[in-house]
Curated annotation (Swiss-Prot):
The name this protein goes by in its record: Mycothiol acetyltransferase
Residues annotated to bind acetyl-CoA 1: L80, L81, V82
Positions with a binding annotation for acetyl-CoA 2: I242, A243, T244, N281, E282, R283, A284, L285, R286
Subunit structure and binding partners: Monomer.
Repeat as UniProt keyword: yes
GO biological process, one term: mycothiol biosynthetic process
Native organism: Acidimicrobium ferrooxidans (strain DSM 10331 / JCM 15462 / NBRC 103882 / ICP)
Length: 310
């Protein structure tokens, strides 16, 4: 068992170690860690972002990291990372991270703390459950190879034309449809203009891959794509957000938008498409199953209530 030290808000001295940990976890687990909004928080010092806590060995090797983020609807969110070659010590590392996080949050009073565990890491989940957390949500990443076959049985025969998103013009209409379509969703349903503009400032943002459907001059649906590592052999396309207006969209528009997004990614030589979906969203899961998507991995959220300070 190694001696562990917790460091709040890691300084520039430890930042390379945090980044190395992230790269190691991504290489071991095969997908990106720290969701996009957490990276944006860190880059922009977002007011909703609290801070990060690292766990180090005596030689300053970073073996664990947690990013804390205040969510106005869901208490405090944590995302925990444990170094792949130290996961046999997950109980100790996670315990140190949660203890430090709890101490830093005591002044907030009783709060629910939500911990995201990427790729359903069994060691990390066991460690959290041992501390009293319980699983309450799971998000699946689905993937399928590209291109979608021209004669694929799920490909719609007749689809309307789509246009691309116009930055500076389409934000209000898009926010209205997005928030109405995702009113039920814990993360996607309450975006505001700054949330959208922060995405537009990201290096990956490309309005050419942000497709809009209109009917009688009104926005009724969209498919927003994203490309990870676009110039590498591991390039991965993502259907980042897709939705139709629940009040106005014609039947079948969702399938047409999905195909348009897949075709856009394939046209740019992306070999694989991915998307995220709640494991309880049976309607969406049935749609993606028809198009040949399969589960790549599952991210799990666990919850624990921070007690009142004594």
């Amino acid at each position: 068992m190694h001696a562990l030290t917790t460091v709040e808000n890691p300084s520039a001295r430890l930042l390379p170690g945090v980044l190395a940990l992230i790269r190691d976890v991504e290489a071991a687990d095969g997908h990106e860690v720290l969701e996009a909004h957490r990276w944006i928080d860190l880059a922009n010092a977002d007011a909703e972002s609290l801070h990060g806590i690292a766990v180090t060995l005596d030689d300053d090797t970073v073996v664990g990291y947690v990013h804390l983020r205040r969510h106005h609807r869901h208490g405090i969110e944590l995302e925990l990372l444990v170094a792949p070659d130290h996961r046999d010590e997950a109980a100790s590392i996670v315990g140190a991270l949660v203890e430090a996080a709890s101490a830093s949050l005591e002044t907030l009073g009783p709060h629910e703390i939500f911990a995201w565990v990427p790729r359903h890491s069994r060691q990390v989940i066991d460690a959290l459950e041992g501390l009293g957390f319980r699983a309450d949500r799971a998000v699946r990443q689905l993937r399928r190879p590209l291109p979608l076959e021209s004669d694929h049985p799920a490909r719609p025969i007749d689809c309307p034309p789509f246009r691309t998103f116009r930055p500076g013009e389409d934000e209000d209409a898009w926010l209205e449809v997005n928030n109405r379509a995702f009113a039920w969703h814990p993360d996607q349903g309450d975006w505001d203009l700054e949330t959208l503009l922060a995405r537009e400032r990201e290096s990956w943002f490309d309005p050419a891959g942000f497709l809009l459907a209109e009917q009688d001059g009104r926005l009724v649906g969209f498919c927003w794509t994203k490309v990870h590592a676009p110039r590498s052999s591991s390039a991965l396309g993502e259907i980042y957000v897709i939705a139709t207006d629940p009040e106005r969209a014609p039947r079948g528009l969702g399938s047409c938008l999905l195909v348009a997004g897949l075709d856009y990614l394939a046209h740019h030589d992306i070999p694989t498409a991915s998307l995220y979906v709640e494991d309880t969203n049976e309607r969406a899961l049935r749609l993606y199953d028809r198009f040949g998507f399969v589960v790549d991995h599952e991210d799990v959220r666990l919850v624990w209530r921070l007690p009142a300070a004594s």
